[in-house]
């Protein structure tokens, strides 16, 4: 829903593998009267080619599961484990389907963990999704980054811009001015 507030896109379509999460998203869309702009389909990214026509999206966004194998603690609650760990799909699955769904010149935006950055760039390039912009996200200015934001373009030419870092908090519970600006406070 934040995307609908921050973009002029005529329509947004979400794909969610977990039925409960898809239902929750649909209820939120209805409560905010956004049914005319946003739809949610419950389905598997690995089968997106059966749900959507090739090259049918100008933009694809993803907040994929970050952890592989035994990285981090696996949540005993299945829905949370599926959201955080590559249980039902891998980043390669997401990249392969994104390359098929994006129109030539279309953009893929994703958030991931910096410890997987090399793998992400290699995988994106493998599927002709050229990394164009990268921004590291820091929880605090004096900490290591814990997220990376990437934009890749289908069929783009090689050249990546590294944006200035994004810092979330000035101090515990207090956002930086940049974050307030992003969220419109």
At which residue positions do the language-model features occur?
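Conserved SAM-binding loop of SAM-dependent methyltransferases across substrates and taxa
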Residues: 1-10
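Conserved SAM-binding motif I beta-strand of class I
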Residues: 11-16
């Amino acid at each position: 829903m934040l995307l609908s507030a921050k973009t002029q896109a005529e329509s947004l379509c979400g794909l969610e593998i977990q039925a409960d999460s898809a239902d929750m998203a649909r209820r939120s869309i209805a409560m905010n009267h956004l049914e005319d702009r946003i739809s949610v389909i419950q389905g598997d990214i690995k089968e997106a080619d059966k749900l959507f026509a090739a090259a049918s999206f100008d933009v694809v966004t993803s907040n994929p599961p970050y952890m592989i194998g035994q990285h981090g603690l696996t949540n005993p609650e299945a829905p949370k484990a599926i959201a955080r760990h590559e249980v039902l799909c891998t980043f390669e699955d997401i990249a392969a389907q994104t390359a098929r769904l994006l129109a030539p010149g279309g953009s893929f935006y994703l958030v991931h963990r910096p410890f997987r950055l090399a793998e992400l760039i290699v995988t994106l390039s493998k599927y002709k999704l050229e990394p164009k912009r990268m921004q590291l996200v820091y929880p605090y200015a004096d900490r290591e980054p814990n997220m990376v934001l990437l934009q890749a373009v289908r069929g783009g030419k090689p050249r990546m811009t590294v944006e200035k870092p994004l810092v979330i908090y000035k101090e515990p519970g207090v956002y930086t001015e940049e974050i307030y600006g992003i969220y419109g406070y």
